[in-house]
Design a protein with these regions (language model features):
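A short, surface-exposed alpha-helical micro-motif characterized by mixed small hydrophobic
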Residues: 96-98
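Helical segment within the ABC ATPase nucleotide-binding domain
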Residues: 70-82
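Conserved ABC nucleotide-binding domain
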Residues: 18-39
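Catalytic Walker B motif of ABC-type/P-loop ATPase nucleotide-binding domains
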Residues: 56-60
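Short, small-residue-biased leader/transition segments that mark boundaries at the very start
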Residues: 1-3
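ABC ATPase "signature
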Residues: 114-115
Length: 133
């Protein structure tokens, strides 16, 4: 087997492993355009993970997803967080509660609260700005 064949085999193996990691192993031969919205997001995350980053920055990764897809995405993010940091920009606080260890709340470009989800949700500044009380 020549060197390029070995490289091709290694790449295929890595793709198969990643497809399993992002729960798309049954969709390896499906065109991306035929995937569900959630599956397309998972594919994007998988493409990022192929580069083995230490930091992922995800902007509203569950926007437009069904409740089940949001749950599966939370599970995926928990699975892939070992050995890397994941920063998620998200307005869906129910989703944030599923995944976050630490929450930072910004308003007009300024940090107004930071801590656990419970701490942030009970912060008077957050309540005033986002709930209008």
């Amino acid at each position: 087997m020549c060197s390029s064949d070995l490289q091709t085999a290694a790449v295929r193996l890595r793709i198969e492993q990643m497809a399993e990691e992002i729960s798309l192993q049954d969709e390896l031969h499906t065109k991306a355009g035929l995937l569900s919205h959630g599956q397309k997001q998972w594919l994007e995350i998988g493409m990022l993970l192929m580069q083995d980053p230490k930091l992922l920055l995800l902007d509203e990764p569950v926007a437009g997803m069904s409740a089940r897809e949001r749950e599966l995405t939370a599970e995926l993010l928990k699975r892939i967080s070992d050995g890397r940091s994941i920063v998620v920009i998200e307005h869906d606080m129910a989703f944030v509660r599923l995944i976050a260890h630490k929450v930072s709340v910004l308003h007009q470009g300024k940090l107004i609260a930071e801590g656990t989800m419970d701490k942030v949700q009970s912060d008077e500044r957050v309540i005033e700005v986002y709930l209008g009380h």
